[in-house]
Amino acid sequence: MADLKKLAEEIVGLTLLEAQELKTILKDEYGIEPAAGGAVMMAGPADAGAAEEEKTEFDVVLKSPGASKINVIKEVRGITGLGLKEAKDLVEAGGKIKEGCDKAEAEEIKGKLEAAGAEVELA
């Protein structure tokens, strides 16, 4: 049981690039495909009825690359600094492009990606 807990902690601690590499390994070597939608539901706070504070940190989430996948890959490379293959894999898989940015930066990134043809949301 302790080994499983340690494994879970390691998985949760992965960076975005490491998680993308793990996905690729699971797909290529073991034939495990990501679930459709790829969303993981997490339990909300215990006091969901209380007034929420205004959010100060945002995650930019790619929902769909749209028809212009190449333009979206170029923008993702510029935003994240990833290599071509890593950016392509990230765009094809969808998910978080950038985590923990302020509202202005998140809106700017969202605008760039949408201008390139992607469907993006802020979380």
UniProtKB/Swiss-Prot annotation:
Keywords recorded for this protein, A-Z: Ribonucleoprotein, Ribosomal protein
Keyword DNA-binding: no
The UniProt record lists the keyword Coiled coil: no
GO biological process: translation
TM ranges: none
CDD domains attached to this UniProt entry: Ribosomal_L7_L12 (cd00387)
GO MF annotation: an example: mRNA binding
CC annotations in GO: cytosolic large ribosomal subunit
Similarity comment: family membership: Belongs to the bacterial ribosomal protein bL12 family.
Subunit structure comment from the entry: Homodimer. Part of the ribosomal stalk of the 50S ribosomal subunit. Forms a multimeric L10(L12)X complex, where L10 forms an elongated spine to which 2 to 4 L12 dimers bind in a sequential fashion. Binds GTP-bound translation factors.
Function text: Forms part of the ribosomal stalk which helps the ribosome interact with GTP-bound translation factors. Is thus essential for accurate translation.
Entry protein name: Large ribosomal subunit protein bL12
Classification of source organism: Bacteria, Pseudomonadati, Pseudomonadota, Alphaproteobacteria, Rhodobacterales
Gene: rplL
